[in-house]
């Protein structure tokens, strides 16, 4: 990993693979996940001629872990610091889970000047269910808005049980280094609440670059309908649902995910 310093002095980390002159593809992992979780995507993207960057923003992976001050706005600013420090142009931003909504935070603050396309991996832009958005986190609505994630991410009873996922589980455990530390610090709980209560639909509607929304058909967290509904919010949106796939769509079914991502990147 290579380090760089954010504008407030916090250390961020990233790795580079592939052709330094290739089109930049920036991979952003989700909540509690590290840059290493993209291990199944890096070789495929690098082999296709891209400059591949996997990033650990503050509080994740090998980056510095401040006890406080990490929210979605700060994550968007961290991403800006990375893109600016490396002077990336026409970058494809790919975000899994919270990494996806981090992209909307970045775009809402800094615009599209450095970005040519966006791919969101199994992340609804609005986790709170409402009359106009039934594609949020299962059983999460105004009635439990401030309590549902008070102790972490609750089980939903949806998706394929881990014991029945076979090789999908093996890939998941490999990419996530055995599952990682599931305990949450007060700072992480604050970030999770900020993530859960945000609504990024206006940011999507303001986007003019191509956006691909990918859903796992068997996601543990939300119905796969979020992908098509999100794509409908932006003029250059498209969506895909991967069969027999969970929330970690790029990890559980990497061949199908990589095939679709590479085909889409080649078109946009």
List where the protein language model places each region.
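Conserved acidic catalytic loop of the alpha/beta-hydrolase fold
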Residues: 74-91
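Gly/Ala-rich beta-loop-alpha elbow adjacent to hydrolase catalytic centers
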Residues: 95, 99, 103
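Flexible "cap/lid" loop of the alpha/beta hydrolase fold
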Residues: 104, 108, 114-148
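Conserved HGGG/HGGXW glycine-rich cap/lid loop of the alpha/beta-hydrolase fold
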Residues: 10-65
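Alpha/beta-hydrolase fold catalytic core
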Residues: 1-25, 47-50, 88-89, 116, ...
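Conserved alpha/beta-hydrolase catalytic His-Asp/Glu region
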Residues: 129-135, 147-206
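Catalytic active-site module of serine/aspartate enzymes centered on a nucleophile-bearing elbow/loop
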Residues: 236-268
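Conserved serine/cysteine hydrolase catalytic core
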Residues: 187-232, 241
